[in-house]
Each structure stands twice: as structure tokens, then as C-alpha cells.
Amino acid sequence: MFKVKILLIGPSECGKTALANFLSDTTESIGADYSPTQGVRILEFESHNLHNGNKSSSCDVELWDCAGDFKFESCWPALMKDSNGVAVVFNPDVPSHLKEIETWYSAFISSQGLLEGQCLLIAHHKPGSGADTNRPSLAPQLNKLPLIHSNLEEEPEEVRQEFNKYLGKVMRMLSESQEREEMSIIT
């Protein structure tokens, strides 16, 4: 079974921890009092029925819920080591988040040379905010990345399905990379 390391990054108070808890089926109530993540939380779980090419498979997921505070910037290289994908979470109702995610993109995605298929933008709508599901106005480099809207109050299973599609893409890329590596050894 593949093991996939996904970083969940983005501005402070955008909903990364609530999303991580939901995706990993961690039992903490949605909408609890805000408590900022210190450094990183690593959640491990199995994800099933992922579409990896023309077959369905499973993988072990390490979801790294990374702190949104820039005081932890010195830890970022250690967090990025051996990561297979990055999901950038932001609250589209907070104008500063739209600008701040450009910094997260530069630090975590372009610096690692990740491919678009290894990345995901998640416009996370907080409970009671009323979800505008239009694509927000983003910088050109961010417009190339796939975007999903997350509303855990109204459509939680849709969020899980979209995240699982993303995991399937990452797994497929890992599988193809492994096959290429094996073929280069043989030839």
C-alpha cells in the first residue's frame, strides 16, 4: 500500500485543523473554540476507493496540519521533506488570505518544483458564512491549480470525495514515477 504525505498549509484561522480533523475522522467537534496549531500536527489514516488510473486502491495518508503563523517559517524545510503533495487552505471571505496564499505557494510549491497535480487549493467556508462557490480572484500562478470549495456544514461528503480524487491523482503520479524509476534501473 502506498504511503502519501500531504501538507495542509495556509493562513492562520482559515480552517486547516477543522478540515484535517474531518478528513481524518478525528473526533473533535466542528466549530470548537479556536486554538492555533503550534508547529505541526500529523494525522494518519487510511483512504479507500481511490481511483488510481483504471483501478481502485487504498493508501496510508499522513496529513500534516501545518501552523499558519510565520513564526514557524524556520521549520518549513523540515515539514516539506519527502512530501508528496500540498493542499493550500484559505478563507475566501478574508481578502488578506487571497494575497497571503501567494507566499505559501512560493514557499511550499514553487520552491519544491511540485506539479499542478500534486497541489490543491481549498476555499474553506466557515460555518454560517454563506458559501460563494465562484472561483475567487487569484494570482496567475494560483489560477493553474485545481480548486475545491469546502463547506463542512452543508456538503461535508462532497469535500471528502474531492479530496479523495486529489489523493488518487497524487497516488497515480507516485506510481508512474516509481515505474519510470524501475524501468531506468532495468534498462
UniProtKB/Swiss-Prot annotation:
GTP binds at residues 10-17, 65-69, 125-128. One of its GO terms (cellular component) is intraciliary transport particle B. Keywords: GTP-binding, Nucleotide-binding. The keyword Nucleotide-binding applies. GO terms for biological process: intracellular protein transport. InterPro entries: P-loop_NTPase. The keyword GTP-binding applies. Pfam families: Roc. One of its GO terms (molecular function) is GTP binding. It comes from the Eukaryota. Belongs to the small GTPase superfamily. Rab family. This is Intraflagellar transport protein 22 homolog. It comes from Danio rerio.
